């Protein structure tokens, strides 16, 4: 979480002009983004399993856009711009969460038949996030196709997870 928040600070500081933010707002938004993200994964896990101790990364994927919408309305900024700038923050934080899955030993893939080795589903998801960050960050910086960043992420993530779930 700390690593994700630090990334958010650096990324949002670079992008503060697009969202017309003061430097201190970058710090507040970075911490809020992480806190809302944690609440999102906890709430979604509770809705899925009834257990508040679990986490589900789908919470971040599905609830964060609602938080972005609320933030855009409260600060009178275009929703598409808020989504474009904050999507890399969400991607990086989700990537850190998957790294935590490796460290804690959860979310491993199915055992490969005839071996004791698991399919590297967590590792593939981390690789997916790295590739998406490499592809999306330049698009956000150049404001290429405004408003397309989050939908592009969702479409690719949906396709990735559809395939990944066969091995989870």
Mark where each language-model region is.
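Hydrophobic, membrane-interfacing alpha helices
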Residues: 1-168
């Amino acid at each position: 979480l700390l690593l994700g928040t630090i990334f958010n600070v650096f990324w949002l500081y670079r992008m503060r002009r697009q969202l017309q933010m003061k430097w201190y707002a970058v710090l507040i938004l970075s911490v809020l983004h992480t806190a809302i993200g944690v609440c999102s994964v906890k709430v979604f896990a509770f809705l899925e399993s009834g257990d508040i101790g679990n986490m589900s990364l789908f919470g971040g994927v599905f609830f964060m856009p609602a938080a972005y919408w609320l933030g855009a309305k409260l600060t009178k900024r275009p929703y598409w711009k808020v989504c474009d700038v904050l999507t890399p923050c969400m991607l990086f934080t989700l990537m850190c969460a998957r790294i935590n899955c490796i460290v804690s030993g959860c979310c491993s893939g199915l055992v490969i038949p005839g071996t004791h080795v698991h399919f590297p589903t967590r590792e593939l998801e981390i690789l997916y996030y790295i590739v998406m960050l490499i592809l999306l960050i330049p698009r956000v910086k150049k404001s290429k196709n405004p408003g397309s960043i989050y939908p592009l992420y969702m479409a690719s993530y949906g396709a990735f997870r559809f395939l990944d779930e066969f091995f989870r």
